[in-house]
């Protein structure tokens, strides 16, 4: 476990920035870089500004602005409220989707539903799809997903493939492990 934790430390923003600065010093020691930071790149950009401000010409942040002085718990509380607001807006726009979501939840409680990879589909995984409602076009994407969920009384195989593809931790497992570390300060 200790070796694994040490290895994961290489994926933290400070480690990434130190690697990037080594590359910059090697390739263009006399030319500062310009950065564009989005999501985790925003956190890396802010870390770069903290550690090597003289190595940067300019930094553009489009997302991933660190909540300085705020804990991960505070960020999550604000995020939960935003997701709840987005869910209310989604169901107000697509009222029929609530009945489909309820039907899906009931179906998942009564049946052992498996995704194509063999993983069990749970109500909680289905609820996780609501986290994407902040993205552009997400309302329509989620509605179309729900709309195609059933063929008669059975779940549509195409629906199951789409849900599987939307499970971020299946394809990005390191995100789940490292996510909260981005909120550490000091």
Map each language-model feature to its residues.
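Alpha/beta-hydrolase fold active-site neighborhood
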Residues: 111-186
């Amino acid at each position: 476990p200790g070796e694994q934790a040490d290895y994961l430390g290489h994926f933290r923003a400070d480690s990434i920035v130190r690697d990037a600065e080594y590359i910059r010093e090697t390739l263009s020691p006399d030319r500062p870089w310009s950065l564009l930071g989005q999501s985790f790149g925003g956190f890396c950009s802010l870390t770069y500004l903290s550690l090597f401000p003289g190595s940067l010409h300019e930094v553009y942040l489009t997302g991933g602005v660190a909540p300085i002085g705020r804990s991960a718990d505070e960020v999550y509380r604000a995020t939960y409220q935003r997701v709840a607001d987005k869910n209310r807006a989604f169901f107000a726009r697509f009222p029929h989707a609530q009945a489909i979501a309820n039907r899906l939840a009931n179906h998942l409680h009564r049946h052992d539903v498996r995704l194509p990879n063999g993983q069990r589909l749970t109500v909680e995984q289905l609820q996780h799809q609501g986290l994407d409602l902040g993205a552009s076009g997400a309302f329509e994407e989620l509605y179309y997903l729900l709309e195609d969920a059933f063929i008669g009384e059975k779940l549509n195989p195409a629906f199951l493939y789409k849900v599987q593809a939307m499970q971020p931790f299946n394809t990005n497992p390191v995100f789940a492990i490292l996510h909260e570390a981005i909120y550490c300060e000091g």
